[in-house]
Amino acid sequence: MYNINDAIYASRLLNIPFNKFSIEDFLEGINIESEHGSINELTNVTNDDLIITSKIALAHLNEYPNYYNKEYGLKKYEEFLKTKLNNVKN
């Protein structure tokens, strides 16, 4: 698990302005995107590199600043779409 100091370090290297999302959102993203590391050798693309992992999180946050928000981010949107698709099938 990465911590706030890791997020601050990465954000400084990547010159992130934090005008559309917070450092906490960024940290949440880094920790979620660590799934692309050595946790699974078949899907390891970052090799647990903080900066590469941070770039993945940053890419998602740049296109959708609420991407990692648990209340209304991507996960909730996916659940909404799944419900809609299930209703269409029935």
Q: Where are the regions that the model predicts?
A:
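Amphipathic alpha-helical packing elements
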Residues: 44-79
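N-terminal alpha-helical modules
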Residues: 19-22, 27-29, 68
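Short, flexible helical or helix-coil boundary motifs
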Residues: 14, 33-37, 64, 84, ...
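Membrane-interface alpha-helices
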Residues: 75-89
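Short amphipathic alpha-helical segments that mediate assembly, nucleic-acid/protein binding
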Residues: 4-7, 23-25, 35, 54, ...
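A short, structured beta-strand/loop element
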Residues: 29-34, 41
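Long, charged low-complexity interaction segments
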Residues: 1-17
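Charged, low-complexity interaction regions
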Residues: 17-20, 39-45
